[in-house]
Amino acid sequence: MSSHSQFALLKQRRFLPFFATQAFGAFNDNVYRQAIIGLLFFLGVSTEERTLYTNLAPALFILPYFLFSATAGQIAEKLEKSRLIRITTSMEIAIMSLAAIGFLTQNMVLLLVALFCTGLQSTLFGPVKYSILPSVLKREELTGGNG
């Protein structure tokens, strides 16, 4: 067994695009949820309404995981993985375009619908991001790829 840095994977064309897609997707989801909460403070909504939206937002993001995880796994098994990654990344761009409209119009309903769709996109991407690694990494690289 050779001793090499797992960070060397980040220089590999077979891993870096996948890693960047995964990292930017997670960053996007977190920034978006926080931006919704920030908008509530900016709009000066009542404490009760702010509490409602602050609790509703994470629930709407998590709900698709409960509703669609099994279906997402089946879809991931049927479609070619790189194609599904392109589809889910395109979905993310479309959803964030919808969210941008929601921010411009300060429409909380539209922002929450986009948040639910973001959760759905993450649910669809989840099975692919875990199942593609064994097909693109060597056995000794899997620990670094998963970590």
PLM ranges: what are they?
Residues G44-S46, S69, G102-N107, S122:
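Short helix-capping/hinge motifs at transmembrane helix termini and TM-loop junctions
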Residues F7-A8, G102, L124, P134:
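Short secondary-structure boundary/capping segments
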Residues M1-K11:
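Short, Lys/Arg-rich, polar N-terminal cytosolic tail immediately upstream
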Residues R13, V45-L52, R83, Q106:
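Juxtamembrane loop-transmembrane helix junctions in multi-pass integral membrane proteins
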Residues Q12, E48, K78, L104-T105, ...:
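Helix-loop interface residues and adjacent transmembrane-helix termini in multi-pass membrane transporters
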Residues A35-Y65:
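Extracellular/periplasmic helix-loop-helix junction of adjacent transmembrane segments
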Residues L98-F103, T118:
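MFS-fold secondary transporters
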Residues L16-Q34, A57-I95, L110-G147:
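Substrate-agnostic recognition of the 12-TM MFS/MFS-like secondary transporter fold
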